[in-house]
Swiss-Prot record:
InterPro entries: Homeodomain-like_sf, Myb_dom, Myb_dom_plants, SANT/Myb, SANT_dom. Residues 108-118 have a biased composition (Basic and acidic residues). The gene is SRM1. Gene3D superfamilies: Homeodomain-like. It comes from Arabidopsis thaliana (Mouse-ear cress). Pfam families: Myb_DNA-binding. SUPFAM superfamilies: Homeodomain-like. This is Transcription factor SRM1. Disruption phenotype: Increased tolerance to salt stress leading to better seedling survival and enhanced seed germination on NaCl- and KCl-containing medium, due to a reduced sensitivity to and reduced levels of abscisic acid (ABA), as well as a reduced induction of stress-related genes. Altered leaf morphology, both in shape and in size. GO terms for cellular component: nucleus. Transcription activator that coordinates abscisic acid (ABA) biosynthesis and signaling-related genes via binding to the specific promoter motif 5'-(A/T)AACCAT-3'. Represses ABA-mediated salt (e.g. NaCl and KCl) stress tolerance. Regulates leaf shape and promotes vegetative growth. It is found in: Nucleus.
Amino acid sequence: MTVEEVSDGSVWSREDDIAFERALANNTDESEERWEKIAADVPGKSVEQIKEHYELLVEDVTRIESGCVPLPAYGSPEGSNGHAGDEGASSKKGGNSHAGESNQAGKSKSDQERRKGIAWTEDEHRLFLLGLDKYGKGDWRSISRNFVVTRTPTQVASHAQKYFIRLNSMNKDRRRSSIHDITSVGNADVSTPQGPITGQNNSNNNNNNNNNNSSPAVAGGGNKSAKQAVSQAPPGPPMYGTPAIGQPAVGTPVNLPAPPHMAYGVHAAPVPGSVVPGAAMNIGQMPYTMPRTPTAHR
């Protein structure tokens, strides 16, 4: 257990510091019971020790935001916090600085690059607000995994701790501007589900209109297509084709066989119904004389 701070006989380890930050982020109400709740979440610490540690933390955050000290380099993903590199508290945390250097010696270069104290951008802070609205305080792992994917859960917890300290700070007129002053994402409710993409409904309506207009209506048939109207036409009497050259003028049944009582040359009464255009019907026996082609004689 690494020693982080010794003041008035109280020893703050890294685990105590993390528990303090989480309890501080979960209890933001301005009441005397707030410090008792925080002390209950940090084992072995009294209310007076919690208040003293809070005052030191506020001082550290104020100096970092004022630009007096450079941004800190996080010692490890599990124990990074916003005030680990404060020069004002370096005398109190001398043992922690040496322990952090020895721990970083065995780490790879990629891990060190990922843990560098890069300042939060405004877009990351807005994503943090969206995740805070959905998951609430304390679920920093879900916020890091689903919203602020560029930050670790511990970095999100540290950012939340500084954000709530900024909200509860009493010297609001004297402090510098910061992204922590952003408390909402626009004027819209972040929990409202998004509607369809603009133009999607119009394209769907146009496709439906084109599909409806593509099938022409048959006169007297409502919305039925011409193909359906032809297939549903009532059957009429047998239809006869035109006589071919060299064959008798007697017609030949085209679609339906002739009834038994119907003979060639007998005129049948016209029956109303739909017929195929161009086909002759109800034609009796007609003689047809084949004209002879004159041949040339030599």
